Design a protein with these regions (language model features):
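Multi-pass alpha-helical transmembrane bundles in non-GPCR membrane proteins
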Residues: 1-186
Length: 186
């Protein structure tokens, strides 16, 4: 029974240290990025943009903070196990947060709110499953990650019509990077 509580170290001490440091830097950069996005949205006079930027930035900060804390604890202590769950759940938050500006600012209307609801639902499902058992629902989590990441395809025409070329390019590159990350993780 005691062996069930033991988690084998997944990373060396130096890997953990580098992850904690780099993700800690990510927290600081996420704060700076969030401030820039909020200032830009406010200068555009967009209340929805300010809210969207705030949500996106907050979820990015949460992701990097949970990862920093996860990598900061020694293996086989309760805090590490708890922050591992938080770390995985925060991925769903960030993917959802990434959609908020696209769904509420770029798309808005019925299509935007529909996509918002679909991605939010998938995020909630993923968070619930990860909170129950990370290993048991790993494949389902992967499916949720990929569905969330590529759900925007259903609105690609409207996205293309409402964003400039660079915006569409960044969206596509972001989707590819999310997918590579999901495949490497899985």
């Amino acid at each position: 029974m005691e062996n069930e509580l033991v988690i084998k170290p997944r990373y060396t001490l130096s890997e953990e240290l580098m992850s904690a440091i780099s993700h800690g830097i990510g927290v600081l950069l996420a704060i700076a990025g969030m401030v820039l996005c909020i200032v830009k949205s406010a200068s555009d006079g967009s209340a929805v943009g300010v809210v969207s930027s705030s949500l996106y930035g907050s979820f990015m900060i949460i992701l990097y903070l949970m990862s920093t804390l996860y990598h900061s604890f020694k293996p086989n202590i309760t805090a590490k196990k708890v922050f591992r769950i938080f770390d995985h759940c925060s991925i769903f938050l960030l993917i959802f947060g990434t959609y908020v500006p696209y769904t509420l600012v770029t798309l808005h209307g019925a299509l935007g709110w529909t996509l918002f609801g679909i991605v939010l639902g998938a995020a909630v499902l993923g968070i619930v499953l990860n909170s129950i058992n990370l290993e048991k629902y790993k494949k389902m989590s992967m499916i949720c990650y990929l569905v969330m990441g590529w759900a925007i395809i259903g609105a690609i025409k409207q996205i293309y019509n409402n964003l400039d070329f660079n915006g569409v390019l960044l969206l596509v590159l972001g989707g590819i990077i999310y997918t590579i990350g999901a495949v490497l993780y899985g």
